[in-house]
Amino acid sequence: MNDCENFSPSPEFKWLCDELLGKIYETSSKKHLIGKPVTVRYLEIITNFIKLWRSTVGNYIYPALRLIVPFRDRRIYNVKENTLIKALCRYLRLPKSSETENRLLRWKQRAARGVKLSDFCVEEIRKRQKDYEGANRITIDELNGYLDEVSQEGNGKRMGYMALTDSRAFNYCLNHMTFMEMKFFFDIILKTRVLSGLENMFLTAWHPDATDYLSVVSDLDVLSQRLYNPNERLRQTDLSITISHAFEPQLAKRTHLSYERVASKLQHDFIIEEKMDGERLQIHYINYGEQIKYLSRRGVDFSYLYGENSSSGPISPSLKLHFNVKDCILDGEMITYDTEKDIVLPFGLVKSSAMNQIQSELAGIAPTESYKPLFVAFDLVYLNGKSLTNLALERRKDYLTKILTPVERSVEIIQYMKAINAEAIKDSLEQAISMGSEGIVLKHLHSKYFVGSRNTDWIKIKPEYLEQFGENMDLLIIGREQGKKDSFFCGLSISDPNEVAEKPRFISFCTIANGLSNEEFKDIERKTWGKWHIFSEDPPSPNLLGFGTKVPYEWIHPEDSVVLEVKARAIDTKESEKRKYRSGCTLHFGYCKQIRYDKDWKTVASFSEFEDMKDARNFYNKRKSHQVTDGKKRASKRAKIGIVNSSEPTALVAPVSNTFSNCRFRVISDYFDSTKRRRISQEDLCSVILEHGGEIVYTSDENNLPQDNLYIIGEKLTRECKILLNAKNLIIRPSWIFSCIEEGYKTPFTESDIFRGELESSMDCSQFYTDFNTASLNHLLETANRGIKNPDSDLLLPEVPLFLFSNLKLAVLNSENVLDTSILEVEFAIKCHGGELVHIENASIIIVFNDFISREDLFSLRQKIASKAVKESTESTPRIPRMVDISWALDSIKDNYIAETEHYQCL
């Protein structure tokens, strides 16, 4: 028997869950209850499992490894979170758009740290059926077979929930799995981590070279067959790239150094390439084109999209290589090209363009869209059995041009220019911005190719958009408050990091908890592990960090920390916030947009930069309507809303008022508060009601008939709402809830309070009775006087977001093809919504009628902007205005929310 083969039948999947996955999950969720360091406990669980596998199953770990590291498995299920949720609701025979389905679709809003969608799904199933106790257990090999079946049913396309529910394999697994098995089965289907970020620990425990080897082969099966004996170590030559196995490519590093410093870092001998907006792919050309693989950096095979041999697909037939080339690997970018407009389109259309061409070829008709995939090669890393990674970039480029013949609009070689100084960088960046490109990439001409590395041999330079500055800020984590979901204290730099300053190097600015996924929380924890200091025991030096009255439980040195890109709609300068944070103000509704891996503590936002835009984002202080607690401190704990429907109403132990005592509420939709421009979820509405003495019910009687003291709250005409209306129910707007809280009693309904339904004239009005006495009259007069003294607040139109574009500097581009009246209408709408109209040179956002402007005029405008920005910038990150289509302004006004400008770029 081969030493790599297993000598025992495949164990049950439940055994894998019990011995490894379940123990890791339990340990990660109960760290504080473990009497030893959690890392030690993790290692014990993993090593014990590996010993158990080797002694009872064998040395071939691949069947289990595919389930333990699902995101590195090459199977493609194309099952998205929403698809799984809807499929499970259909499996449970729940009505379409049910409350359960809607809650699951919004699971991230209620997810504590470490909680995944699979936990919510299993909880719903647990409420409706018993745990599986049958004798027919699914083995690991059987589960892999069922997953193969699900992958084949997807056939490279995104699987819909109907198809998933009808899948024989999917249904069999659900009917023959315990709740714990289901949890990890769902994680595997969604390709999320099942080992709590401990994959590298597991691989290293299996074999010391496993992690390094996986970075050059990206194939779990190859790894399992090659590294079955931990005592046999790999040679250095084994860790080089090989044909048909994906590897992690070299990446460019972003820097904010001056142009001169960048040129110096590249030893004044480098090339400049355009930065492409596409998907990084490597083409493996095998045996003269008999087989061609298109692999992503993580080993995902997209050959079915672009052509599995030289005669199939939209790209492979255009790979014209020298007749002596038997095998090679091309590193490059797959982009989307519009053949009609002769332009490169945004990244999101890459795969759909390939699928459109494939479907058109199969149907024997012309493509329905004008866009198609285009591969741009920029490196050659393998040729005829030899790795070229140790060769200088100049030689690799030379070989690339000799073996590959470009085919226009299908396969091209990226153009580059040699450079030696900062002036060349400026000129190239100016040209890239003029063309609407992402930026440029600089590469040291004599550098080697470093697999899986991001270093300064390759440097990318991208412009920063003015519109982002003031809404998007790169902030450094300087502290954290631990809880179910960690909140991070973020700070601003207030001094030059290269100088010794008396002031703190960083000061607290805001606390961020929203926007980070569980995986990002774990990634931050991995990067900062062992570097936190307890504030009460070891406070930071005031010359290092400065905090206000609000201090974190733990703090961290800036050089050990992580940078977050934080987005917010306003700046909060209330007196209470001035004391909490050392900066004297904070962000209102701030959330993390992404972790900035390309930045460090030296390149984050500074306090002086923040001061330049602070006044433009303080209008929230002027809007005081719908204040729930009238300035009083709210209860520190809110009612916890269940994640599933409950037949019993939920009650609060200690409400802050009795405004809604003896009243029951059924909340059927979210609420958008137009005065504060924020959305309040169903769960938060329920919490507010509970805090003021009300009860929450999730269902009415089976006929949905009106009931005494039952208030149905909603402002969306959903299917559930229509059913309740047909049963003669009255649907009340959520704004009535806040009106009652402000007044301190249940106010009578007015027409504006009714969303749908008719208010019966004969209804019992005793429920609105209040004891009107002298104190009440004085309160009423005081309220009226306040309104007279401050008439501005009454003049604000609550339904019109007057401050939507507040202090944004906008310009509408004039064009001879656009009527003057159309331009005036747009400018008037911008002014009505608080925008400031300025000249194009001073704008942070330029609004263009994209369908009515010529490409020549657009290029000319970009050229002027680029020239000005590059000349004025001292760092290699010029700030330029964003150019957006007119639909950006119209959609923002329509939705009462500033739309993401990157989705409306002019092409």
UniProtKB/Swiss-Prot annotation:
| One GO BP annotation of this record | DNA biosynthetic process
Q: Which UniProt keywords apply?
A: ATP-binding, DNA damage, DNA recombination, DNA repair, Ligase, Magnesium, Metal-binding, Nucleotide-binding, Nucleus, Repeat
* Top-level taxon: Eukaryota
Q: Which CDD domains match?
A: Adenylation_DNA_ligase_IV, OBF_DNA_ligase_IV
SUPFAM superfamilies, alphabetized: BRCT domain (SSF52113), DNA ligase/mRNA capping enzyme, catalytic domain (SSF56091), Nucleic acid-binding proteins (SSF50249)
Q: Which residues form the BRCT domain?
A: 655-754, 800-906
**Residues that bind ATP, according to the entry?**
E273, K275, R280, E333, F378, E438, K443, K460, K462
Q: Which reaction does it catalyse?
A: ATP + (deoxyribonucleotide)n-3'-hydroxyl + 5'-phospho-(deoxyribonucleotide)m = (deoxyribonucleotide)n+m + AMP + diphosphate
Q: Pfam families annotated for this entry?
A: BRCT_2 (PF16589), DNA_ligase_A_M (PF01068), DNA_ligase_A_N (PF04675)
Q: What EC number(s) does the entry state?
A: 6.5.1.1
| Major enzyme class | ligase
The entry's active site is K275
Question: At which positions is Mg(2+) 1 bound?
Answer: E333
InterPro entries registered for this protein in UniProt: Adenylation_DNA_ligase_IV, BRCT_dom, BRCT_dom_sf, DNA_ligase_ATP-dep, DNA_ligase_ATP-dep_cent, DNA_ligase_ATP-dep_N, DNA_ligase_N_sf, LIG4
Q: Which residues bind Mg(2+) 2?
A: E438
The terms under GO molecular function for this entry are: ATP binding; DNA binding; DNA ligase (ATP) activity; metal ion binding
Q: What is its main location?
A: nucleus
Its annotated compartments are: Nucleus
Please give the function described in this protein's UniProt entry: DNA ligase involved in DNA non-homologous end joining (NHEJ); required for double-strand break (DSB) repair.
UniProt record similarity statement: Belongs to the ATP-dependent DNA ligase family.
Q: What is this protein called?
A: DNA ligase 4
| Native source species | Kluyveromyces lactis (strain ATCC 8585 / CBS 2359 / DSM 70799 / NBRC 1267 / NRRL Y-1140 / WM37) (Yeast)
| Highest classification ranks of the organism | Eukaryota, Fungi, Dikarya, Ascomycota, Saccharomycotina
Gene designation per UniProt? LIG4
